């Protein structure tokens, strides 16, 4: 979920005096661990270990405003799994996961290949640590998996690099999970999605999960956004209407654009306030 180049503005308050932060930075090979990174914040929310003090501090600030954020992130991951299983069950055997984020349990290639043996997956992310972790999976014998380093704001490069591993004359599922909300309006997210889908074969799919403020107290939502203003990428919650426009030219699968916990229609009730909208559109 970090397919974007960063422009850090905020440093962990203890960065200059915290011995742990200095030790972590040395261990990370010079990587800046004093600026919160959206991939590592997400990893922290999922209970992962690939995060540093600044990421945990930022995540804690978000949790103080939106206490159900950890559950919402896990539900987003579960939504990803349901979507990949559904698409593989429909016969799609090629997946392009843009802004894939740090590897965790049940990664896209594992889910896709369990449901559809022979499925090919390309992971695309800008963050070099994410890319290094993903490539480490290949070293452990993962087959049909490729990793490219690319910025979501450069969709032409993503397609060119992914095209070395995927056959775009056949259906491809483009996965944009918890990534488009890190694009500002100036980045023209709708145009980026249009380019990513422009040359897809009929029967291809685009799946999106996107942060929204529709179910959040406005003041708390703004406070949480401020945390990301100082991280590696700002977060831009959008309304259902704005997110729906990402699917222009596509045919939305039932139940349409909805709370991720309600997709598919047989999914369980949310249990937490609305945080992410999600949906799947097909290329006619």
Label for each model-derived stretch:
Residues 233-257:
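Short alpha-helix
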Residues 217-233:
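Short, glycine-/aromatic-enriched active-site segment of Class I SAM-dependent methyltransferases
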Residues 179-182, 211-216:
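Short "lid" loop at the C-terminus of a central beta-strand within the Rossmann-like core
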Residues 1-150, 154-156, 160-168, 197:
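Rossmann-like AdoMet
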Residues 146, 172-176, 192-211:
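Conserved beta-strand signature within the Rossmann-like core of class I S-adenosyl-L-methionine
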Residues 152-153, 162-191, 196:
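A short SAM/SAH-binding and catalytic strip from SAM-dependent methyltransferases
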Residues 1, 186, 220:
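Anion-recognition interface
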Residues 256, 261-284:
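Core SAM-dependent methyltransferase catalytic element
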């Amino acid at each position: 979920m970090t397919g974007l180049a960063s422009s850090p503005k905020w440093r962990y308050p203890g960065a200059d005096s915290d011995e742990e932060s200095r030790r972590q930075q040395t261990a990370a090979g010079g990587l800046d661990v004093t600026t919160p990174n959206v991939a590592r914040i997400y990893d922290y929310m999922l209970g992962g270990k690939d995060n540093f003090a600044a990421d945990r501090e930022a995540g804690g600030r978000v949790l103080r405003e939106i206490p159900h954020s950890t559950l919402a992130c896990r539900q987003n991951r579960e939504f990803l799994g349901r979507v990949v299983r559904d698409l593989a069950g429909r016969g799609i055997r090629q997946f392009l996961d843009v802004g894939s984020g740090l590897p965790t349990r049940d990664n896209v290639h594992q889910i896709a290949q369990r449901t559809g043996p022979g499925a090919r997956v390309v992971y695309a992310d800008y963050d070099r640590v994410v890319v290094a972790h993903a490539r480490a999976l290949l070293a452990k014998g993962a087959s049909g998996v490729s990793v490219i380093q690319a910025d979501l704001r450069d969709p032409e490069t993503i397609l060119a690099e992914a095209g070395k591993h995927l056959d775009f004359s056949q259906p491809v599922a483009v996965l944009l999970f918890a990534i488009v909300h890190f694009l500002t309006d100036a980045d023209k997210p709708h145009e980026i999605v249009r380019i990513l889908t422009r040359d897809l074969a009929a029967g291809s799919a685009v799946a999106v999960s996107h942060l929204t403020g529709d179910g959040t107290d406005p003041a708390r939502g703004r406070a949480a956004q401020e945390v990301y203003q100082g991280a590696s990428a700002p977060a831009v919650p959008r309304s259902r209407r704005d997110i729906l426009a990402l699917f222009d030219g596509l045919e939305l699968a039932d139940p349409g654009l909805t709370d991720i916990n309600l997709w598919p229609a047989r999914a369980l009730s949310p249990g937490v306030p609305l945080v992410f909208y999600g949906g799947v559109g097909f290329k006619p």
